[in-house]
């Protein structure tokens, strides 16, 4: 009986010690989970590389997320810990998991994402659809080296010629075979909107003269048919395919607004007649800078452009992002 009592006592003591050991170990894990993140000061720019990455107000994964970052969003990082980056957002501090942010080079756009649109208008239809542009275009990422090689074979039908037609008494007269087209500058306090026009050149392959226009804060180009004098206004001169069968016109918007483009089929060059195929708004990327000859057709028939993901168009300082990607666009006949 004494032996039985002794065994029971020993089992009780062993069980208590084991329970206390497990409890202490559990308490140790809890302490580790609540460990304070220690941040080391840094100064660098990173980008969100995960769609739906969580934006933390405090560096604690157990805190319920209030909002999310957008893919490609630039971050100005001011601190780094074991698990988090500390970011400056205006006058506030935000935190993102280290695995969700990296250098610009880690950003990727798939062909499906490049060909995605917010809307597509076919011809002159008013009802739009959404979806892929793959029926009309093939768009793919390329290397900078391929882009630079293609620019050596750039095709440009625009001939700069500013002397053929010049203004006289603020009036620019474009003499065509069947008409004289006049543009008058309107500049002064009495006019609600200033207007200014300059002859800048011609596109012989389409039998067009080209006039640049500034109306208020808006800029554009006007083509004038050399024979009839018919005018067509563009936000930017269209890019002409090497086989002269298509026109590709891009309308770029500042900051984070999506870019639009229109694809035309050339039905006649004399007189110049074109048919609108589609107008679309791009979903995921923007042209880097259309004014610096970053967009061009090459002899192989592809349109080349330098771009940025739409959320990376501006850097963390709100300035035009100097980093960029490169694409080529093929027109499906």
Please give the residue ranges for each predicted region.
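Sec-dependent bacterial lipoprotein signal peptides
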Residues: 1-14
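Bacterial signal peptide processing site
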Residues: 17-20
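Boundary regions of SH3-family modules and the immediately adjacent low-complexity/disordered segments
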Residues: 23-39, 88-138
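Beta-loop motif signature
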Residues: 26-84, 120-130, 175-189
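Terminal domain-start segments
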Residues: 109-213
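Blade-terminus and WD-like Trp-Asp/Gly-His loop motifs, strongest in beta-propeller folds
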Residues: 166, 200-206, 238-250, 294-303
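Surface-exposed loop/turn elements that mediate protein-protein interactions on large endomembrane-trafficking
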Residues: 170-190, 215-233, 262-282, 316-333
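Beta-strand C-termini and the immediately following turn/loop, strongest in propeller blades
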Residues: 211-216, 249-255, 260-262, 305-311
């Amino acid at each position: 009986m004494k032996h039985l009592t002794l065994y029971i006592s020993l089992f009780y003591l062993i069980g208590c010690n084991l329970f206390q050991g497990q409890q202490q170990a559990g308490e140790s894990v809890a302490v580790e989970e609540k460990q304070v993140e220690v941040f080391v000061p840094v100064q660098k720019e990173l980008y969100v590389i995960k769609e739906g990455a969580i934006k933390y107000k405090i560096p604690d994964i157990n805190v319920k997320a209030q909002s999310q970052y957008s893919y490609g969003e630039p971050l100005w990082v001011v601190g780094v810990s074991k698990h988090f980056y500390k970011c400056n957002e205006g006058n506030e501090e935000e935190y993102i998991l280290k695995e969700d942010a990296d250098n610009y080079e880690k950003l990727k756009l798939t062909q499906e994402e490049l060909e995605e649109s917010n809307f597509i208008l076919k011809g002159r239809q008013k009802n739009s659809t959404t979806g892929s542009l793959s029926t009309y275009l093939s768009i793919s990422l390329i290397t900078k080296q391929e882009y630079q090689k293609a620019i050596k074979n750039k095709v440009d039908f625009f001939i700069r010629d500013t002397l053929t037609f010049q203004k006289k008494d603020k009036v620019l007269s474009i003499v065509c075979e069947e008409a004289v087209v006049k543009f008058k500058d309107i500049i002064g306090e009495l006019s609600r909107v200033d207007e200014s026009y300059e002859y800048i050149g011609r596109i012989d392959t389409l039998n067009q003269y080209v006039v640049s226009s500034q109306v208020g804060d808006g800029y554009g180009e006007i083509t004038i048919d050399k024979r009839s004098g018919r005018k067509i206004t563009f936000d930017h001169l269209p890019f002409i395919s090497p086989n002269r069968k298509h026109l590709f016109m891009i309308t770029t918007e500042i900051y984070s607004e999506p870019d639009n483009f229109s694809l035309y089929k050339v039905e006649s060059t004399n007189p110049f007649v074109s048919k609108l195929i589609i107008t679309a708004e791009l979903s995921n990327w923007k042209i880097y800078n259309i004014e610096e000859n970053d967009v061009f057709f090459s002899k192989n028939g592809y349109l080349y452009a330098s771009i940025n993901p739409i959320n990376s168009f501006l850097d963390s300082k709100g300035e035009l992002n100097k980093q960029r990607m490169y694409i080529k666009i093929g027109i499906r006949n």
